[in-house]
């Protein structure tokens, strides 16, 4: 099986690359997710510049922001995993990468006759909640940012190519520069349990998401255009997430229930990078039905994102400047 991976140096893409490498390593143990097979796995990763990649990975230089560089990247491939995206606030760059770049990549996949495409997207395409356990068919997209609007546009191009589109929730673990850093900032600016910490969130640890993406890429038949949530099946209570992070020394202990108006007043009195809309995402219910893809891939969801956090604690301490 010949796999092409975009975004191979990013947060999720690097985890998928490591998982693909482990999956294809000689002598790797057979598991529910890696049954006995005589097929050889080869990986081609495209990156914007030369970087060190695991042994045996073919590296090509290409950039979704420069569609002309994508020519031929999918030649000879059986599977394309698109884990590349731009998540900043620059609307022009978001459109260039997430919309136009995805369109160009899917055209390359079509031209090369790639049989299976897995495209990574985000539950942010649903916009503002609260969202409580909805399936993909229960919610209509209502993106509220340049990043989520352009990623929804990218989904359209991928689905036209028959892709399996995976909408990931909040992703934690080594490489996370948004979820836990945002919580750390908000814990300083809005000290207390926001709405009592009752909000439920769809989280997934990056290593578990990488397992799921790999299983979907290698085990599922060509989707013919389908969308799934890529989240851990069990939502996480905000208070449990905050307490786990505090126990690891990543956040100060928080206590005292805050109403929404109190949260907003404290936020405005203590300016920072995180906006009110992002606090809303973290404090209110934003969880989604997530069992179907794990079941289809015959993939164990693992112990859950809270149980995975200790393994990433040292990385987070460095990222947050706590060491």
Question: For the regions a protein language model found, what residue spans apply to each?
Answer:
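N-terminal Rossmann NAD(P)H-binding glycine-rich loop of SDR-like oxidoreductase domains
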Residues: 1-25
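NAD(P)H-binding glycine-rich loop region in Rossmannoid oxidoreductase-like domains
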Residues: 51-52, 57, 61-100, 108, ...
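Conserved Rossmann-fold NAD(P)-dependent oxidoreductase catalytic core, especially the SDR/UDP-sugar
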Residues: 103-146
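Substrate-positioning beta->alpha
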Residues: 177-181, 195-218, 225-229
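Mid/C-terminal beta-alpha module of Rossmann-like enzyme folds, strongest
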Residues: 212-276, 317, 321-323
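Amphipathic terminal alpha-helices
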Residues: 290-295, 300-323
